[in-house]
Amino acid sequence: MGAVRFANNTICSEHYIPYLSQMSCVLTAALINLENGKMDVCHVGDTRLYSLRKDVFTKITSDHSIVGPKEESGQISEEEAMVHPSRNIITRSIGKEMLYDGSEFIQTHTLHLEPCTLLLCSDGLYDMVHSSQMKRILQGPIPADERVEKLIDAALEAGGKDNVTVIVIDLMK
């Protein structure tokens, strides 16, 4: 959490420079500790962390966006969220305001590790590729780097114009 607060405050300290005055970014980070079997997740914005465990594909983070809470509460479907005109309007980001504590602003989780596949991704992926297709690709019997390529290809083939950031991590016991 301290590193995220430091990054946030460093970005904020550059706002006096006119061309940097609107600078901010989103962040999802996972710190995996194999010694204690836990993973700490730190999240601000609309990048996502998913877990695929025993055929169950779960979104771990909650989007800090206009549309995210509507999708999570069931007010709109995943399909509706993918094309919603406000889908890319974020409500929290790194670099918008100075943080002195940040514990309420930054979403954190501690998860107990089990064999699973983790997917960290930007909206360039999940705005274009349905979660069921992401799950199918992640379940493929190919190395993680090839699954990354397949996910990126799926987003681009669906007409993706945004940047597509994808990280796949296989955790095995």
Where is each model-derived feature located?
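PP2C/PPM-type serine/threonine phosphatase catalytic domain
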Residues: M1-K173
